[in-house]
Amino acid sequence: MDRRHRVYRVFNQEMYVEPNFKVVKELGQGAYGIVCAARNVASKDQEAVAIKKITNVFSKSILTKRALREIKLLIHFRNHRNITCIYDLDIINPYNFNEVYIYEELMEADLNAIIKSGQPLTDAHFQSFIYQILCGLKYIHSANVIHRDLKPGNLLVNADCELKICDFGLARGCSENPEENPGFMTEYVATRWYRAPEIMLSFSSYHKGIDVWSVGCILAELLGGTPLFKGKDFVHQLNLILHQLGTPDEETLSHISSSRAQEYVRSLPKQRPIPFETNFPKANPLALDLLAKLLAFDPNRRISVDDALEHPYLAVWHDPSDEPVCDSVFDFSFEYIEDANELRRVILDEVLNFRQKVRRRSHPTNPTVNIPQPAQTVPSNDNGSFNVSSSSSSQTSNKKRHDHSYNETAAIDHKSDDNRHN
């Protein structure tokens, strides 16, 4: 903000990048912005980062809130190893801006790309991935936050099998009192295949079990190589769930606040649950036992994150002393702000305060407006492959070091995913 920026053309858009960074590759683009990979050319090791440009921040209030939510939560969760780390924030012209730049940890791919590669994953991989997701969720939930959009595409993975949760734009608070959850159902566009049945059926309350259901869907996808509930639409999605889990009992149905939804479920033929052994005959029985607990239809009977971490399937990784909780509850009070100018001020303050924190120096009193320079064209993502290794002398000895690798030797070749970090 207080120095001249380099200008690059990324996905046909101009990106203004801090002068000590060189953009090296386009990574992904989506409805909310674009992402590129860059290197810190001023440092000895030339560390790599992902730079996300969130666009059209003030075109709609829902996008403004989403951007602010993402920034605040990334900062709040910055200290956990299984949540993507934010390094820096930037706004080019603080007096008139519609974009925010986020400098983040660069990860090689996401879990969606790994699964889609079609190459074999081992049970040891499944254990490690699910354990890391649950560790991240424990930290998130302890701050009274529900992620609400857990899916393989929002789980970033490095070559050493280190996994990190990203994309908090849809997150909300998890108070049992609906009045304390501003906008809980607003913008609920989480991917249908990982959406909990209580969301689809309008249960009378929502809580952390929403994320637990998504973890179950992810485990099933790891076991089978394809989504378990691949619904084409709302009704098809619900029917797939009921076909697998069976007809819910009357006590569960009583929690559905929508009378029409209750009537629909009751109108269907009674179905018995299909054992997960039928879907995954070669799977570890302990994995299937955990899966059944993660995918309990009734959220009140669904396993909690803490209990899931203690499940025998994850025993090789579980260490209560190494599974921290967040030291403070996240403040969602900004969700009540409706004035666009006030939201703009809050975003600017958030960026300035974080920049001050990471630089350990005062705010620039008069931040200068960027002077545009000729844009440099950036190479597009070439979909180059890389390996996720799982060779190690001991799982258990490496657990404390968070070196997520394995005794057996296996390499996962997969294509880079264009939408990672986006």
From Swiss-Prot:
Protein activity control: Activated by tyrosine and threonine phosphorylation by skh1/pek1.
Statement: the UniProt record of this protein carries the keyword Phosphoprotein: yes
Gene3D superfamilies in UniProt: Phosphorylase Kinase, domain 1 (3.30.200.20), Transferase(Phosphotransferase) domain 1 (1.10.510.10)
Limits of the Protein kinase domain: 21-314
Domain of life: Eukaryota
Basic and acidic residues bias spans: 411-422
Alphabetical GO biological process terms: cell integrity MAPK cascade; intracellular signal transduction; negative regulation of glucose mediated signaling pathway; negative regulation of mitotic cytokinesis; positive regulation of calcium ion import across plasma membrane; positive regulation of calcium-mediated signaling; positive regulation of cell wall organization or biogenesis; positive regulation of transcription by RNA polymerase II
Biased amino acid composition, Polar residues: 364-379
Cofactor: Mg(2+)
Residue positions binding ATP: 27-35, 52
Protein name as annotated: Mitogen-activated protein kinase spm1
Compositionally biased spans, kind Low complexity: 380-397
Domain comment, as recorded: The TXY motif contains the threonine and tyrosine residues whose phosphorylation activates the MAP kinases.
Leading EC class: transferase
